[in-house]
């Protein structure tokens, strides 16, 4: 350490302008008086003086009182308490002349080392700790997710199923309105039949009146259908009237049967229950027959018109051919393949062989010749 300090002093030299970097070593074994009296030293130093640009040492509280071992009056605590502060400089502890040589050597070596380090003027900068922005202050909070959910929580599937049900014909209001009304009318007809069965014991006349109302309604339907047929000039009014008369006769026969049954019930009081039940069944059968006749009246009238026209009027073949019949049109369309294009199935393929137009024209020309 001493060799390094001497080499440093030789390189820098005492005549350098930067005097703070120059350290003059005191002679070994010399005391403070010799240092002050040495005229060879360019810088007069006093032991314990604070060097410029250095920090002050922290002096513990024990060293500031009479327990300081470096104090000159360490053994005389009672007499020299006031002089204890004079031995302690600002921040440093100065050994006194009463110290032994070993303590002086240790103090001189430590002071030389510290002076050398201070002479280097090394600035130590302590940067403020920077917070790492990449590291989060707290751990992420886990969010529990249910692995299994109830059937009611799956809104998407329930919506899809409802939409699929809505697209079906059974739930479509536009397409199934007529079928819904039809089911209601059938249910009402069954209810009316059950009411007839249950109430014929005391209200047999009501069943007959309801039958008459149904027959009148049936006659009104016949009149409306006949009016529609009269709009067609090719229909035969006489045949329509005959059909109406026949239907009315059937209704009258039904009414007569009901009246006969009622008379029999009056004559035989013991068989009232059975006859009333028979009347109810007859009324239900009549209502079903009326509904069947009502459903097929248009077809029967049209077929009767055609048959009567063929039998009675042999000269009206042209008029009969003008009567529109859907089934006849479809048959003619299928058979007449020479003038109509072939029908196509669901895949777009023709069922019949395609005939080019020039062949059709040639065939037609050959027929004319």
Curated annotation (Swiss-Prot):
Residues 1-42, 60-107, 146-177, 214-369 are annotated as: Disordered. Residues 30-42, 70-86, 219-324 have a biased composition (Low complexity). Residues 155-169 have a biased composition (Acidic residues). Residues 12-24, 87-101 have a biased composition (Polar residues). This is Putative uncharacterized protein DDB_G0275317. It comes from Dictyostelium discoideum (Social amoeba).
């Amino acid at each position: 350490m001493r060799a390094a300090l001497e080499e440093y002093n030789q390189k820098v030299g005492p005549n350098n302008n930067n005097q703070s970097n120059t350290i003059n070593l005191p002679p070994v074994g010399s005391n403070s008086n010799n240092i002050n009296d040495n005229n060879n030293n360019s810088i007069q130093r006093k032991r314990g003086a604070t060097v410029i640009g250095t920090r002050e040492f922290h002096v513990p509280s024990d060293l500031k009182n009479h327990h300081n071992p470096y104090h000159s009056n360490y053994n005389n605590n009672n007499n020299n308490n006031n002089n204890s502060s004079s031995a302690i400089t600002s921040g440093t502890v100065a050994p006194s002349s009463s110290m032994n040589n070993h303590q002086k050597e240790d103090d001189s070596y430590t002071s030389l080392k510290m002076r050398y380090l201070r002479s280097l003027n090394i600035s130590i900068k302590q940067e403020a700790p920077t917070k790492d922005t990449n590291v989060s202050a707290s751990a992420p909070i886990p969010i529990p997710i249910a692995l299994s959910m109830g059937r009611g929580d799956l809104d998407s599937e329930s919506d899809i199923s409802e939409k699929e049900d809505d697209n079906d014909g059974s739930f479509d209001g536009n397409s199934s309105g007529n079928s819904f009304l039809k089911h209601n009318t059938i249910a009402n007809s069954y209810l009316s039949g059950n009411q007839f069965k249950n109430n014929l014991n005391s209200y047999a006349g009501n069943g007959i009146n309801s039958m008459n109302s149904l027959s009148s309604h049936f006659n009104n339907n016949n009149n409306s259908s006949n009016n529609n047929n009269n709009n067609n000039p090719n229909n035969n009014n006489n045949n329509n009237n005959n059909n109406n008369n026949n239907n009315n006769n059937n209704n009258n026969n039904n009414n007569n049967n009901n009246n006969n049954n009622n008379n029999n019930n009056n004559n035989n009081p013991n068989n009232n229950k059975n006859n009333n039940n028979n009347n109810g069944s007859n009324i239900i059968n009549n209502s079903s027959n009326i509904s069947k006749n009502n459903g097929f009246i248009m077809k029967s009238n049209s077929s009767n018109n055609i048959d009567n026209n063929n039998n009675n009027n042999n000269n009206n073949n042209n008029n009969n051919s003008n009567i529109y019949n859907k089934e006849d049109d479809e048959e003619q369309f299928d058979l007449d393949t020479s003038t109509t294009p072939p029908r196509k199935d669901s895949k777009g393929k023709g069922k019949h062989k395609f005939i080019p137009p020039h062949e059709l024209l040639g065939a037609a020309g050959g027929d004319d010749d």
